[in-house]
A protein has these predicted regions:
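RNA-binding accessory domains that recognize and position tRNA/RNA substrates
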Residues: 1-172, 178, 187
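N-terminal Rossmann-like NAD(P) cofactor-binding module of classical short-chain dehydrogenase/reductase
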Residues: 184
Length: 189
């Protein structure tokens, strides 16, 4: 399976526990945090892991990829993200399909569960994932204001690769004061 670094860093998953149905995860490790000429991460969809946890069926303790600098386990520990493996993720997916989203926790063995599970829907997830200040990328004849509601880095890259000056603003920013040719409102949680 490819794409777990991108999925884990996708702001759209903020506050959620990600349950992956592909049977083997971790086999190619995690790439470096390098940035491109625009100051955008080359390998991730944002600056950090946004999920609150990861549930997988089988974890590969050995990884192999020319671009890997650490294991998935090391990366998740660095960012204090809990994970669990050895779980029938396809059965969980069936339950979610039939019943809709559910609250949940990943609890270390021997520890007690919290009496009340935090509901991430009570938090303003867009405020959590949005940039906190205006950020400019690239240069060009056309200027586009991007309202950041949880934008992925690949969307930023798509604009600047096409010669657009991109002005990324927080979700609650008064962009009407700016000079721009186009407006893009990103997706998010």
């Amino acid at each position: 399976m490819v794409g777990y670094p991108e999925s884990l860093t996708d702001p759209s998953y903020s506050g959620q526990i990600l349950c992956v149905t592909y049977p083997l995860i971790g086999n190619y490790g995690v790439p470096d945090e390098g940035i491109d000429q625009y100051g955008i991460s080359k390998n991730f969809e944002s600056e950090k892991i946004w999920v609150r946890g990861l549930v997988i069926s089988e974890y590969s303790f050995k990884y192999s990829h020319w671009d890997a600098v650490k294991s998935l386990d090391e990366w998740m520990k660095e960012q204090k993200i809990p994970g669990i493996y050895g779980v029938d993720t396809r059965e969980i997916t069936k339950m979610l399909r039939d019943n809709g989203s559910m609250l949940g926790q990943i609890i270390p063995e021997g520890e007690a569960a919290e009496e009340e599970v935090h509901d991430p829907n009570t938090d303003n997830q867009i405020d959590i994932v949005s940039c906190k200040e205006v950020i400019r990328y690239g240069s060009g004849d056309k200027k586009v204001v991007l309202v950041d509601c949880g934008v992925k880095h690949n969307i930023l890259r798509c604009f600047v690769d096409r010669g657009v000056e991109l002005i990324r603003v927080p979700w609650d920013y008064d962009f009407l004061t700016l000079d721009y040719d186009g407006l893009f409102i990103s997706n998010g949680p």
